């Protein structure tokens, strides 16, 4: 079994790492907040305080981090320690530009695969994420399949690009549902009546996500993803959506909560 280093044990990373342990892979884990590694250590992983130490003997390195800056910082730490023949699977949502930057920095003999995921914490726990794999994923596809079905997207960076497209549609749909519900509130409609009508129409999936429970995708992460999207193309509607989620992320009670909390924030917002 391949030796795997997993860096980033947040809401998504921790359950994903558990699937690798369950499959029998020797696993070394690292997280900026070291205490989060405790449950995985109890389940059989080895933790380290040094990301370079985590990857030194790894056949496969998986990163699931907050965004481009965190990935660049980790790259500075681990690139000198990656051994020839290793695969780095970057699973964070960082956009194709960051993937291209990393590709230019890869040591000889190291393969970079961009493989962000579709789905939230419930699908991560169940092993039913959708994996969008760009680049030469042949050597790690069987490992990625531990997390859910794998879609090969093409050249390096295409997985990251498609993830940005998917997240833009999801976040935009949730914001549109929030505004539709805000209109229903203003017109005096019962919440259940408006919600059921929207759920039965073309926005049914967005309605389900806007009112989802037991999942997690923070408003701060939504801001990061929309920013990446609007920096890549002129997207006037998403620029308005960015304003909604930036306002939600400015509220300390909402910033790290699931985007369903932002829906409530948007509905109550009086300045937009």
Language model features by range: what are they?
Residues 1-62, 101, 121, 151:
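NAD(P)+-binding Rossmann beta1-loop-alpha1 motif at the extreme N-terminus of oxidoreductases
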Residues 4, 92-168:
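Rossmann-fold dinucleotide-binding core
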Residues 21, 38-42, 103-107, 141-145, ...:
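Class I S-adenosyl-L-methionine
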Residues 34, 51-129:
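Rossmann-like NAD(P)(H) cofactor-binding subdomain of soluble oxidoreductases
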Residues 53, 60, 66, 70, ...:
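Amphipathic alpha-helical hairpins
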Residues 159-269:
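Helical "substrate-binding/catalytic lid" subdomain
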């Amino acid at each position: 079994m391949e030796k795997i280093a997993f860096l980033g044990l947040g809401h998504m990373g921790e359950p994903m790492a558990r699937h690798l342990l369950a499959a029998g892979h020797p696993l070394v884990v690292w997280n900026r907040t070291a205490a989060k590694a405790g449950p995985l250590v109890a389940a059989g992983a080895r933790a380290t305080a040094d990301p370079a130490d985590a990857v030194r003997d790894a056949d496969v390195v998986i990163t699931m981090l907050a965004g481009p800056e965190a990935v660049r910082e980790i790259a500075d730490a681990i690139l000198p320690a990656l051994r020839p023949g290793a695969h780095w699977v970057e699973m964070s949502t960082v956009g194709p530009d960051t993937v291209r930057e990393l590709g230019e920095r890869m040591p000889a003999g190291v393969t970079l695969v961009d493989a962000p995921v579709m789905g939230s914490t419930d699908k991560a726990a169940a092993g039913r994420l959708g994996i969008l794999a760009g680049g030469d994923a042949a050597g790690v596809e069987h490992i990625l399949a531990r997390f859910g079905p794998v879609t090969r997207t093409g050249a390096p960076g295409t997985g990251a690009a498609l993830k940005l497209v998917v997240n833009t549609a999801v976040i935009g749909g949730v914001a549109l549902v929030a505004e539709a519900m805000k209109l229903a509130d203003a017109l005096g409609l019962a919440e259940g009546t408006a919600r059921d009508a929207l759920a039965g129409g073309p926005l049914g999936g967005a309605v389900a996500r806007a009112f989802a429970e037991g999942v997690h995708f923070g408003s701060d992460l939504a801001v990061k993803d929309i920013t990446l999207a609007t920096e890549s193309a002129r997207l006037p509607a998403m620029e308005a959506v960015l304003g909604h989620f930036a306002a939600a992320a400015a509220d300390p009670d909402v910033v790290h909560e699931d985007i369903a909390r932002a829906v409530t924030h948007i509905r109550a917002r009086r300045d937009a």
